[in-house]
C-alpha cells in the first residue's frame, strides 16, 4: 500500500476511478484535443489539490485514477474539472469568448468507484482500455 498523504491534521489515502463521456457520447476526443485535454485535466486537478495518478482519453470517454483530499467531495472535483474544461474547449476550439450558457461539451453525470488494494488492477485497466475496446469491436464483427 502507498504512503498516505497528509493535511494539517489528517493522514489520508482517497483514490477514485472516474469515467465520464462527451455529450451524446460523440467520438470527439482526437489528436490535438486529446493532448490539450490531458494537460488541462492535470492542471485543473492540481487547482483542487488533487493528483491524476493515471488517465486515458478514449475518443468517446475519459478514464482517470485520481487522488482527492478528504476536504473535497468527489462531485465537487468532477464538477469543477468538467465545467472548467468544457469552457476552455469552447474558447479554444470554437472561438467562443463569453455567453457559454446553454451549451455543454460533457454529458451530465459520471461513474465513480473507490480504489483500495486493487489500485494496480485499476491502473492496468485504464492503461489498456483502448486495446480492450478494439479487441471487443473485432469480436463484434463476427
Predicted regions and their residues:
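Basic nucleic-acid-binding interfaces
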Residues: 1-142
